[in-house]
Amino acid sequence: MNNAIILGIIWHLVGAASAACFYAPFKQVKKWSWETMWSIGGLVSWLILPWTVSYLLLPDFWQYYGSFSIATLLPVFLFGAMWGIGNINYGLTMRYLGMSMGIGIAIGITLIIGTLMTPILQGRFDVLLGTPGGRMTLLGVFVALIGVAIVSYAGLLKERAMGIQAEEFNLKKGLILAVMCGIFSAGMSFAMDAAKPMHEAASALGINSLYVALPSYVIIMGGGAIINLSYCFIRLATLKNLSVKADFSVAKPLLITNILFSALAGLMWYLQFFYAWGHAKIPQQYDYMSWMLHMSFYVLCGGIVGLLLKEWKCSTKKPVAVLCIGCLVIILAANIVGLGMAA
């Protein structure tokens, strides 16, 4: 195995670990509403960091964005908004299912929907049925379904074991949100495809191939930010049991700690761009490895962090054992789909 592939695997691990673990700092936020901490993290990950990075990368920030027509930018923005709906559902999935189970189910469903949606929308579903690679991909989808079912069963066992001690754990609500997450998260893939003219323009300015996609995040995540922040602000303004004033009236040391942990979560979320570095380091003939590595590391890291945070501190070990089996099945499914892409 050459150094490029080893480096690619390392960057994939960093990107997937950041994506899977970003919710961990939120777990340290105390006496704040979910909406307030999600908004603070979002301001960092969807607005501050994309704008800052793009400003540092581009020779002329305003000229670059001004060179595109509304017809080019609008689809990128709208698909970003679609992704934003998926992102809210992802965050709420973590809230109601926890990290280890939430990531397992959300990624499993995203794997299923993401694999099937593109060929269906492009009218090429027959390719999945009529080719060896397509049939292997469908096998991977079937295995992912089994994995999601196993992880869901682990959640049911956890629900029974923890009972009233699980304050926000809600299997039914979490499963519905995970399905919504899987459907709407496809917006990121569509947005990146629509943003290709922006990537080409960045490349023409001499920006390194590792970074050409980053300026498009200003538009993509701008769409997502409007959806996420609107959802949070409307709830904070209309629900009697939520209050920004109350959240920011906590003791000063706790206020600073909450802001820092929320901002750290936003930073870790943004560091998913290391995935692109890993993809760029993998030789073209092994492109399918990117999908396999990212999904596998994502589920693995999410499960490990969830266990370390003692989300599964039950009176019996059976739920944890079932969870581990389910996560391994989803990792297997990701690898089968990757092999199907390579066939």
From Swiss-Prot:
Pfam families: RhaT. GO terms for cellular component: plasma membrane. It comes from the Bacteria. It is a multi-pass membrane protein. The chain crosses the membrane at residues 4-24, 38-58, 68-88, 101-121, 137-157, 175-195, 207-227, 254-274, 289-309, 320-340. Keywords: Cell inner membrane, Cell membrane, Membrane, Sugar transport, Symport, Transmembrane, Transmembrane helix, Transport. It is found in: Cell inner membrane. It catalyses: L-rhamnopyranose(in) + H(+)(in) = L-rhamnopyranose(out) + H(+)(out). GO terms for molecular function: rhamnose transmembrane transporter activity; symporter activity. Uptake of L-rhamnose across the cytoplasmic membrane with the concomitant transport of protons into the cell (symport system). Belongs to the L-rhamnose transporter (TC 2.A.7.6) family. HAMAP family: RhaT. This is L-rhamnose-proton symporter. The gene is rhaT.
